[in-house]
Amino acid sequence: AILNIKVRILSRKEVAPNIYLMRLKAPEITQDALPGQFIHIKCSKDNYPLLRRPLSIHRIDKEKGEIFILFQVVGEGTKLLAQKVIGDDLDIMGPIGNGFNIYPESRKIMIVGGGIGVAPLLALCEESIRQGKEVRVLIGALKKELVIGEESFKILGAKVDVATDDGSYKYEGLVTDLFERTIKEGWLADQIFACGPKSMLKKISEIALQANINYQVSMEERMACGVGACLGCVCKIKTKDKKEYK
């Protein structure tokens, strides 16, 4: 069930320029939340901005009843959210959306995150490792100071590689180039999970299809209702017979 509740901010930190990590006390959400789902946040006490902001659940701590969100300041809503302080309450709805589907038979998992696209992938990595999978994570960023989550993934036990567009840190080039190289080197995952810019996801899907590897993507869309009813956030998808919106 989708809940509409108030949650308290336990911590907030600017982890990279204009990118914030928040820890929220939300035991009601942690009970049912799955990696890949999101919450819908009201960013101010009045009705401006009118629409809630959809933010991925970055990490789920069921024992403590806490969730983490990782977000980038891109407009009025996220700017207001970044100004919140420890102890403030947030009006949220969630958990919403389809979570990632980790197949029981999958032994090797590849996770690819571009920019703020790493947001939903830490919870996925943690759950995959909990299930005994071997996990490899590829992170892409424009430059070194915008690389997010490298240490967090490593602490969980994943092997992590990083690509920066300008070559200021580790592999020089796009994360899709690093992804292609990793597959060509023979590291064949049973499943690939990705989140990031649409151009990145398109390239990932092309390479995964060519290599005949199952892949799932998490897409970022502007939202109104958050549940697909108003058709504001639906994406055009291809099924075996036709194209439809989901």
Describe each PLM feature range.
Residues 19, 33-35, 50-51, 102-105, ...:
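Short glycine/proline-enriched turns and hinge-like loops at secondary-structure junctions
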Residues 198-199, 221-246:
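Local cysteine-cluster metal-coordination motifs and their immediate loop/turn environment
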